[in-house]
């Protein structure tokens, strides 16, 4: 690995996290996330391997919670997979950033979607539960203490399984994104923040010690880490 990426750089701040960032650029970023996650998020494989069996087992009471849902694109993507499998699933996204919720509220959503300006610990205090709990690109934003707290919340909230997906830091991934992304994504924070996200992200051996007991870390191509908890309340 290049010395440049030999260690995480958790002190980097992403432009879209600035409360004073340009709103048009921010909204364009939310819109373009859908393309990014379709291309490299690997959520169809995650769904088939880790989510679908639990959702089928839950029958007509299946539900998915997305912690830190951003603009809601992951839930929209998963809804398509569930619909293809004739699964009735309730979708809930929580997001503490009011700007994301305002963006979401301007979009059209099916009746079985709910979005809340909330955090995971608030849902724990409300004693809520979901079949599967997920997050996407959340881990690298959190301090070790925050990560432990969100993992514990997710353990409580999930009846069947938790899957947290994030980038794995690598020179090849950084180089590929730096080369290709500027050709695809304009007038947004996707390129600049994507590169910063890679620099902030973990490698597999770095992430494992920061997760509570009962969690495991798996690699998934391209350049993904999945933190998975297979416990649950039922």
List where the protein language model places each region:
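N-terminal, positively charged/glycine-rich alpha-helical extensions of SAM-dependent methyltransferases
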Residues: 1-31
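Class I SAM-dependent methyltransferase Rossmann-like catalytic core
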Residues: 23-46, 54
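Class I SAM-dependent methyltransferase SAM/SAH-binding core
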Residues: 65, 71-74, 78-122
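A conserved beta-strand element that flanks and buttresses the S-adenosyl-L-methionine
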Residues: 134
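A short, conserved alpha-helix within the catalytic core of class I
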Residues: 142-153
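Conserved beta-strand signature within the Rossmann-like core of class I S-adenosyl-L-methionine
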Residues: 159-167
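C-terminal alpha-helical "lid/dimerization" subdomain adjacent to the S-adenosyl-L-methionine
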Residues: 167-210
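Conserved Class I S-adenosyl-L-methionine
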Residues: 200, 204-230
């Amino acid at each position: 690995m290049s010395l440049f990426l030999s260690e995480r750089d958790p002190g980097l701040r992403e432009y879209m996290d600035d409360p004073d960032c340009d709103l048009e650029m921010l909204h364009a970023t939310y819109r373009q996330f859908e393309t990014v996650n379709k291309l490299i998020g690997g959520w169809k494989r995650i769904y088939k391997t880790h989510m679908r069996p639990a959702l089928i087992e839950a029958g007509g009471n299946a539900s998915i919670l997305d912690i830190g849902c951003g603009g809601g694109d992951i839930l929209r993507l998963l809804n398509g997979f569930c619909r293809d499998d004739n699964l009735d699933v309730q979708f809930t996204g929580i997001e503490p950033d009011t700007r994301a919720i305002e963006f979401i509220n301007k979009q059209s959503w099916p009746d079985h979607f709910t979005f809340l300006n909330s955090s995971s610990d608030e849902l724990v205090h409300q004693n809520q539960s979901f079949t599967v709990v997920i997050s996407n690109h959340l881990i690298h934003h959190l301090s070790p203490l925050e990560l432990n707290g969100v993992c514990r919340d997710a353990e409580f909230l999930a009846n069947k399984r938790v899957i947290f997906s994030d980038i794995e830091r690598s020179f090849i991934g950084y180089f590929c994104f730096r080369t290709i992304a500027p050709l695809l994504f304009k007038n947004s924070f996707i390129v600049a923040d994507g590169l910063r996200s890679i620099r902030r992200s973990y490698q597999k051996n770095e992430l494992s010690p920061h997760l509570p007991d009962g969690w495991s870390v798996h690699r998934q191509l391209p350049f993904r880490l999945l933190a998975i908890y297979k416990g649950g309340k039922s």
